[in-house]
Amino acid sequence: MMDQTVSNNFKMIYIASCGEGINAFHLVESTLVQFPDSDITVVKVPHIRTESQVDHLLDRVKDVESLIAHTIVEPNLRQYLVTKAEEHKIVTIDLMGQVLNKIETFLSIRPLGKPGLYRETHQVDLKQVTAIDFALAHDDGLRPESLDEAEIILVGLSRAGKTPLSMYMGVMGWKVANIPYVPGVPMPQTLDEVDRRRVIALNINIEQLLSHRKMRQESLGTSDMHAYSRRQEVEVEVQTAQKYYITKGFSMIDVSNKPIETSAEEIAEMITRRFKAQAHLKD
């Protein structure tokens, strides 16, 4: 459920949500900007739908100095979390319950208490459309003159997964550009002019990269072995790329055998942690 190992030396805030928890995560991160000297880590725990999942969460955090902020809309499960957390002396913040109660009183209508309704009824909003359009317009090194408008810039070798990751993050509402790294081919000058903290280099192991490239060749109807898919050349290409990323000071993440969703969440959390309320650029 959680993808981070927690050290007892840190204070933690866990975002427990029956959905993705993205909005709650941004709310907490934006609030933490007011506490610049705090040493605290925020972790999302999405898709909390059962009491056993609540128990698992509490078992993981009970020995850590932590706080649980939650956006659980199902009232019984929400109360279960609050009650069990109190038993473990864990502080909780209800980010959803008070809002639901006030609106229920105002409208004199009971809420449905069904998770994910907003996502179902607002599948595509303006922010998503804008972000997806941006990803399409800045795919594979296009429009380098407007890299400064990107919230995230992905750099990686051919077939490292830049395009699908850019598109997925566009659906999440992030404006992402991606630039291919080809040894011997100059990178755009504008890449040196942007905030390098927004540049994320994608590392991928050689076996998976070779597999992706061979599949690409087959889809194009070409099976001739050449530098694009020969192991020796690809090994050199990977080493050269990594040296370039290190020289430029780019952050690197390993996307080998990792679902796009996991890589996207990792990058989004990294950028949000670095830029807080300024993670998303204003139009």
UniProtKB/Swiss-Prot annotation:
Keywords assigned: Kinase, Nucleotide-binding, Serine/threonine-protein kinase, Transferase
EC numbers for this chain: 2.7.11.32, 2.7.4.27
Descriptive protein name: Putative pyruvate, phosphate dikinase regulatory protein
Family matches, as InterPro entries: Kinase-pyrophosphorylase (IPR005177), PPDK_reg (IPR026565)
Pfam families: Kinase-PPPase (PF03618)
Catalytic activity: N(tele)-phospho-L-histidyl/L-threonyl-[pyruvate, phosphate dikinase] + ADP = N(tele)-phospho-L-histidyl/O-phospho-L-threonyl-[pyruvate, phosphate dikinase] + AMP + H(+); N(tele)-phospho-L-histidyl/O-phospho-L-threonyl-[pyruvate, phosphate dikinase] + phosphate + H(+) = N(tele)-phospho-L-histidyl/L-threonyl-[pyruvate, phosphate dikinase] + diphosphate
Record family assignment: Belongs to the pyruvate, phosphate/water dikinase regulatory protein family. PDRP subfamily.
Function: Bifunctional serine/threonine kinase and phosphorylase involved in the regulation of the pyruvate, phosphate dikinase (PPDK) by catalyzing its phosphorylation/dephosphorylation.
Molecular function via GO: ADP binding; ATP binding; phosphotransferase activity, phosphate group as acceptor; protein serine/threonine kinase activity
HAMAP family hit by this protein: PDRP
Residues reported to bind ADP: G156, L157, S158, R159, A160, G161, K162, T163
NCBIfam families for this protein: PRK05339.1 (NF003742)
Domain of life: Bacteria
